[in-house]
């Protein structure tokens, strides 16, 4: 096999691996954060309590829905 062709194929394989790895990692992280959001309802309730608000279930659901809506954009 020609040396130039071998080098070309190695470079192409590396580029394909880079692109595939990037998109694979991106999809994994999106799924991870969708399944395990960085903030939970308990954290939001504690934050509301610290701000002097009474954390009702309705308020918690509104905040969680807003966060989920922002993640989908």
UniProtKB/Swiss-Prot annotation:
The keyword Cell membrane applies. InterPro entries: UPF0154. Keywords: Cell membrane, Membrane, Transmembrane, Transmembrane helix. Pfam families: UPF0154. It is found in: Cell membrane. The keyword Membrane applies. The chain crosses the membrane at residues 3-23. It is a single-pass membrane protein. Coiled coil: none annotated. Its main location: membrane. GO terms for cellular component: plasma membrane. Belongs to the UPF0154 family. This is UPF0154 protein LJ_1506. It comes from Lactobacillus johnsonii (strain CNCM I-12250 / La1 / NCC 533).
